[in-house]
Amino acid sequence: MVKLLDTDIKTSEVKNWKGINILHFKGSSCSQKLRIFLNEKKIKWKSHHINLVNGDNFSEWFLGINPRGIVPVLVDDGEVHIESNDIIKYLD
């Protein structure tokens, strides 16, 4: 499981997010896999679209959430998790 340490999260606003929040890109196969899982399990989640084409994943804001600059990212009540397979295991 890839859960970021609190000290790794530089975009502090996400530490206050409540519920299941997914940062994703519509064309990312890993994001698509996670969205399918969430819908199959009927898990309610809030969408935060990250435009990879425009390079949003390399913005200071996004890198402050995930220093690897990849999607999807799960923020669950302020805890940040990355890597789609690990996120699915965590939520299942």
Which residue ranges define each predicted feature?
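GST-like domain detector, emphasizing the conserved glutathione-binding G-site
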Residues: M1-D92
